[in-house]
Amino acid sequence: MSSSQHGKSPDQTKYIFVSGGVLSGLGKGVTAASLGLLLKSRGYTVTNIKCENYLNLDSGNINPIEHGDVFLCEDGLEADLDLGTYERFLDVNVGQRNFTTMGQIYLKVIEDTKNLSFNGATVDAIPYVPEEVIRRIKSAAKGFQIILIELGGTAGEYQNAIYYEAYRVMKLRQPQDVIHVHVTYFPSPEHINELKSKPTQLSVKMLNSMGIQPDFIVGRAERIIDNKRKEKVAF
C-alpha cells in the first residue's frame, strides 16, 4: 500500500486481522497497536477493534481476578485493557465502536429476528452471526483507511470460531483488502535448549483447516528465531 492511496474513500478500507495461537497472553493487543502506530506514522488513518469471545455485554461485570482489570473509556464503556493499549499507542479516544463481544453480537441477531429484520427467514448461526460480525467491523472502520481487528482467544477454540468464519468470508469477498497476521510462540525447553517450531506449525494447520492461510506470522520467543525455524513455518 503506497502513500498515493491516502486519498481513497472509506469504502476502500484495508482490514488487518490479528489472531493468536499456541497459548494465550502472547501480546496480540500490543502487536495490533504497534502495527497501527507504524501505519499511522506513514500517514494513514488507523483504528482498532477488539472482538471478545465471551457472552458478557462488556468487561464491567467480569471478576477482575479471572479476566484482569477493565479499561474505562471516555464514553463510559468498561472494556478489555487492550483498548487502553490502542488509546496510548494511537493517541486517540476509544469506545463502543472499538469493542464487541459475542454476547453483543448474538443479542443483536436475536433482536433483529424479533423485529422481523430477516423477513421471517430461519435464522441460523451461519451465516447470520458472522454477517453481524462483519457489519460491526465495517461500522468501526468508517472514516478510516485501515482497521486492525484483534480476535480474542486462541485459534482452535470453539468460542471464537464465528470470528474466524467472518474473516474467511471477508477474505473471499475482498481478497485485496483483507490480510491475516497470526501471533504465535516458539518454546525453548530447557532440557533441549533449542527453539521448537512444531507448536506454531500446528497452529497454522488449525487455521488452514478453517480455510485460512495467514499472510504474516509474528513469532514470540525467548531467543532470536533462526532461519531454519523461519523456513519451516514459512513452508
Where are these regions (language model features)?
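Flexible phosphate-sensing "switch/lid" loops adjacent to ATP/NTP-binding sites
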Residues: 1-235
